[in-house]
Swiss-Prot record:
GO terms for biological process: DNA recombination; DNA repair; SOS response. Keywords: ATP-binding, Cytoplasm, DNA damage, DNA recombination, DNA repair, DNA-binding, Nucleotide-binding, SOS response. Belongs to the RecA family. It is found in: Cytoplasm. The gene is recA. It comes from Chromohalobacter salexigens (strain ATCC BAA-138 / DSM 3043 / CIP 106854 / NCIMB 13768 / 1H11). The keyword DNA-binding applies. Can catalyze the hydrolysis of ATP in the presence of single-stranded DNA, the ATP-dependent uptake of single-stranded DNA by duplex DNA, and the ATP-dependent hybridization of homologous single-stranded DNAs. It interacts with LexA causing its activation and leading to its autocatalytic cleavage. One of its GO terms (cellular component) is cytosol. This is Protein RecA. It comes from the Bacteria. ATP binds at residues 67-74.
Amino acid sequence: MAQDDNRSKALNAALSQIERQFGKGAVMRLGDTPRVATPAISTGSLGLDIALGVGGLPMGRVVEIFGPESSGKTTMTLSVIAQGQKQGKTCAFIDAEHALDPTYAEKLGVNLDDLLVSQPDTGEQALEICDMLVRSGGVDVIVVDSVAALTPRAEIEGEMGDSHVGLQARLMSQALRKVTGNIKNANCMVMFVNQIRMKIGVMFGNPETTTGGNALKFYSSVRLDIRRTGSVKQGDEAIGNETRVKVVKNKVAPPFRQAEFQILYGKGIYHAGEVVDIGVQQGLVDKAGAWYSYQGNKIGQGKANAAQFLEDNPAIMEEIENEIRARLLSTPKPEAESQEKAAAAQDDDSLV
């Protein structure tokens, strides 16, 4: 017992010295902080929010979205920005590809007047702007589109055909080392859009890899693999893409879940269609033949008409969506838990 007391005193002395040297809160017991559910921003896709396990993409983390060309990567990031702006959050878009279409962004629900946009000349400039925005503490969501377009200054100033081996990977590695701590402190989500490249000479396994080295894979809390699986057709005309998103890495919930949804051209993620599909799966929306009904009332013949009814009646759609989220998102109630523990501790004290 005496030895335990000495160890405890030594630990307390060390903690006091650390707090004096580095400030209060430099070291603390994990149980001292209140447990809160991970704050998240919806992706705009109900199925993907459920697959992510926390109702969306987590705040204060790095997120990577990658996939082939025209798979919906930028559409996904603009959808997240639109959802964030609805919650009153400040969003920024670092357009390294110089390909942002304001008209399309507006159609997806983005408020252009409030969106901060930067079109940097070099990769260093883009990441420096990102770091300064994070450190300001006034930005909630930052999108970098894309990692492949973050061209190092040496490459831009050099001759065409010059070899710059590993330059972009070193740039990303250094930037992420610098910015990660600030991202957590500012509770800001930074989303990196990435492209796919092929590894040469791979005989077995997946030859696909993402650009910018391995650092982003390690620092990301969530990695989403987005793919186009087919076309949505109205008669002979293609009006959208069938899209599948796989959560290949998730530090805030179980990974490897999948979500499938439609992205309609000029409209974005087909949210009402997802609510109908998942509502049928959960037994909230009844389907008899081609007719869909909710609480005994017919809402439309065919999925398109049922979805249109929900779009015209947002209160009913919100009611169905809230019920789906309550059933499928097993979010703990940390406040209730902490209150129960406090009450139990008081009971124990009174018994003593």
